[in-house]
């Protein structure tokens, strides 16, 4: 049993059998210890002759696990004059040989490095006995990207190009948002799920309601489609509580929130603000509409305070008024998901007898894959689509 940095491990799987031919780096056994499991690879090629361990047994470093018959090796020694090499070549061979000897990485890490096109010799291991961990690969990849960005920023366009370019200063808001977006994109494994929902009935009701209020001269405030989406999302968060959570990376725990506050992104002269509607699940459509209008106006006049922009559980990014079909919104940490809304379009849909025109709204759901799996996300966005297509589900 090789030294993998753990005092004792349990055998949970034996991957080979007696008389089986094995190759270097082929997995022999799978062990588990200290809340992690890994494959132990073969250092040689040969044939398995005896297996000394069994599943469930606990073993320590240097324990005998298998006996193998090593394939024949050609020990033919060439003549003295044939093996005289330049000192520089010998030094290079010796250097690489030493690297191979003291190289510490599990097969999983080796495969991951190959997939990421990372040379493990360039990675500094921070695990026990300098073992290379997944976090070391993440750090190495992050440093590479930062170096590329630095090099890109150093591009010199030359004197002939200077008259054809113009530099613009980023506003303080753009700088802060840019830093947050970069950090969230680098640290959160994003997955984006897409769906399309029929809002024909909902839009007819919305227009009818606004026309009646306008004719009665009770209000000049129109209820937007966004208000209905916010209310439905709050309902979905109650049904799918993992979406209303945060991930505590330090102690590896998910923090579920007992309140539902929903932020909505708003663009003001290329500056992005995310006001937060509080306790959405406890308010009706008219209350939410009034608060949405108030916060939107405060954003446009740049009068939002800290209370208006903190405490969010989930964010909605609405680009429907601008255009576009789909996009991948970036999660607003410490939240674990964000819903993107695009421009609705009339499309043909089949009602079982014929094609009819339907108003279809594109939805884009990005979520943190460390917390939420694909099936759970699919159920969440499907639930939102079903309720938006028939608001009667809100009273169920």
From Swiss-Prot:
Pfam family for this entry, one: 2-oxoacid_dh
The Peripheral subunit-binding (PSBD) domain, residue ranges: 104-141
GO cellular component: cytoplasm
Entry's cofactor comment: Binds 1 lipoyl cofactor covalently.
EC number: 2.3.1.12
Keywords in alphabetical order: Acyltransferase, Lipoyl, Transferase
GO biological process, one term: pyruvate decarboxylation to acetyl-CoA
GO MF annotation list: dihydrolipoyllysine-residue acetyltransferase activity; lipoic acid binding
Cofactor(s) the record lists: (R)-lipoate
Keyword Aminoacyl-tRNA synthetase attributed: no
Source organism superkingdom: Bacteria
InterPro entries recorded: 2-oxoA_DH_lipoyl-BS, 2-oxoacid_DH_actylTfrase, 2-oxoacid_DH_E2_comp, Biotin_lipoyl, CAT-like_dom_sf, E3-bd_dom_sf, PSBD, Single_hybrid_motif
Catalyzed reactions: N(6)-[(R)-dihydrolipoyl]-L-lysyl-[protein] + acetyl-CoA = N(6)-[(R)-S(8)-acetyldihydrolipoyl]-L-lysyl-[protein] + CoA
Positions of the catalytic residues: 369
List of residues that carry N6-lipoyllysine: 35
Keyword Acyltransferase carried by entry: yes
PANTHER family associated with the record: DIHYDROLIPOAMIDE ACETYLTRANSFERASE COMPONENT OF PYRUVATE DEHYDROGENASE COMPLEX, DIHYDROLIPOYLLYSINE-RESIDUE ACETYLTRANSFERASE COMPONENT OF PYRUVATE DEHYDROGENASE COMPLEX
UniProt function note: The pyruvate dehydrogenase complex catalyzes the overall conversion of pyruvate to acetyl-CoA and CO(2). It contains multiple copies of three enzymatic components: pyruvate dehydrogenase (E1), dihydrolipoamide acetyltransferase (E2) and lipoamide dehydrogenase (E3).
Family assignment from sequence similarity: Belongs to the 2-oxoacid dehydrogenase family.
SUBUNIT field: Forms a 24-polypeptide structural core with octahedral symmetry.
Protein name listed in UniProt: Dihydrolipoyllysine-residue acetyltransferase component of pyruvate dehydrogenase complex
Organism for this UniProt entry: Buchnera aphidicola subsp. Acyrthosiphon pisum (strain APS) (Acyrthosiphon pisum symbiotic bacterium)
């Amino acid at each position: 049993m090789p030294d993998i940095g753990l005092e004792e491990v349990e055998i949970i799987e034996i991957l080979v059998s007696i008389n089986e031919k094995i190759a270097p780096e082929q997995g022999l056994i799978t062990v588990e210890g200290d809340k992690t499991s890994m494959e132990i690879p073969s250092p040689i090629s040969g044939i398995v002759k005896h297996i000394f361990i069994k599943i469930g047994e606990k073993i320590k470093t240097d324990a005998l696990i298998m006996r193998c018959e090593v394939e024949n090796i050609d020990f033919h020694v060439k003549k003295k004059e044939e093996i005289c090499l330049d000192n520089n070549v010998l030094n290079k061979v010796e250097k690489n040989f030493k690297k191979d000897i003291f190289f510490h990485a599990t097969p999983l890490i080796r495969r991951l490095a190959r997939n990421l096109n990372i040379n493990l010799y360039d990675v500094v291991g921070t695990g026990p006995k300098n073992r290379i961990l997944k976090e070391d690969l993440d750090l190495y990849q992050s440093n590479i990207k930062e170096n590329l960005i630095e090099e890109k920023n150093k591009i010199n366009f030359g004197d002939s190009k200077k008259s054809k370019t113009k530099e613009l200063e980023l506003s303080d808001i753009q700088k802060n948002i840019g830093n947050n977006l970069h950090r969230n994109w680098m640290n959160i494994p994003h997955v984006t799920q897409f769906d399309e929902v029929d809002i024909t009935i909902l839009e007819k009701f919305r227009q009818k309601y606004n026309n009646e209020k306008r004719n009665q001269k009770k209000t000049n405030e129109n209820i937007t489609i966004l208000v209905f989406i916010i209310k439905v999302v709050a309902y979905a968060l109650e049904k799918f509580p993992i979406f209303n959570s945060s991930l505590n990376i330090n102690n590896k725990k998910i923090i579920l929130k007992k309140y539902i506050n929903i932020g909505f992104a708003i663009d003001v002269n290329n500056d992005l603000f995310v006001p937060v509607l509080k306790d959405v699940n406890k308010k009706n459509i008219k209350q939410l509409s009034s608060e949405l209008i108030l916060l939107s106006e405060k954003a446009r006049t740049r009068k939002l305070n800290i209370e208006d922009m903190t405490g969010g559980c989930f964010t909605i990014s609405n680009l429907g008024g601008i255009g576009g079909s789909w996009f991948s919104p970036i999660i607003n940490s410490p939240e674990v998901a964000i819903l993107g809304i695009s421009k609705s379009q009339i499309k043909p849909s089949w009602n079982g007898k014929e094609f009819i025109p339907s108003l279809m709204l594109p939805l884009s759901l990005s979520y943190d894959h460390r917390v939420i799996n694909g099936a759970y996300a699919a159920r969440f966005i499907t639930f939102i689509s079903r309720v938006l297509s028939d608001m009667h589900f809100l009273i169920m």
